[in-house]
Structures are given as C-alpha cells and as structure tokens.
C-alpha cells in the first residue's frame, strides 16, 4: 500500500475515500499536484514528488485513480466506494483502495476503508494486507481528523496489527490564483521515521511539507 499524505493531492484521495457524499448527477474531476516531500500516513515516500489523478462521483458512488512519482517507478492507486450524508450532518462511507507499483519501490497493498464524519470531525479505519514480496502481512490503520473552516486541520494516525507506529500532522490549506496551496508539519514515531540518532538507532522524525495542486 504505500503511505500517502501529499497535502493537495494525497489529501484529496483521503478525503474522497473517507467522506463521499451523495450528489444528484455524475461528475468527473481531475487533479495534478506537487509536494516538496511525499508523506503517506506519517511515512516518507519520496523527496520532491509530482502526482496526477482522476475521480468520478455519482449518487454517492465514487471511483478514481491516482499516481505519484516514487523514484523507482510509479505508485498507482485505484479506489472505489459508496458514501451517504444524512440530514443530521452525519456522513458514512465504505470503500476499497489498492496501491500498486511499476518498479521495485514496494509491493501491492489492498485495503477496505470505513469512514464516519460529523461537522469538523472525521474518523477513518482501514484494514488491509501487504503482499510483502511473497511474505504477506496484515495491518490496520486508524485516524482522526479535525478540520476548521479557515483551512486549518489536524490529524492523528495509528498503525496496528503487524505494522506499528503513529504520527501527528497539522496543516493549513488555501487557494491562490485557482491553485490549491498547502503547508503541513508532521511528527512521526521512530517506527515510521527515516531519521536516526547519533547511536545509529531510529528516532522520532519531523518534517515541514509544502504543496501545490490544481483541480478541475
């Protein structure tokens, strides 16, 4: 699966997968993006990464594909699902996401995604399997996001089962000249970090990520 949180582009995938809502007519949208560092669920994928995606939504059903440069080939994601939003403001969704790779960067991840949202709060839970180059592993992931009307957001995420680690992400997104801009600070646990201390052991990591994207 690789771990994706590429602000303008990666967050578009996460939000579409977790908080889809019903619409009266079919809609197709496209997106392109660039991030100074590509993070997914607290894990660094690549420094300086470009991405592009396409999404379809009709009457609560959504489907799409998203691809990003991961250095050794491409990450290509496919996802679909169904979401509803009730008069009370509560939203719920269920979907599937597959993460595939054209090179040797990683092996396939496949997962089922569940989402709940109400007001400024959204809760996501995913359960999946990593092919592991012949040694498959099961994992799950839980995240809680709080989004403000001003564009500020905060997310805490927790890996479980055969994966381990947690992270905190706080960011701000805004539009400028028809582009989606973003900045985020990420703190991840030593299990997810790519940083090491003077002793050579993994340490907690920190990163500031800038992004720009365009949707139409």
Segments predicted by a language model, with ranges:
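Outer-membrane beta-barrel proteins
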Residues: 2-8, 15, 20-216
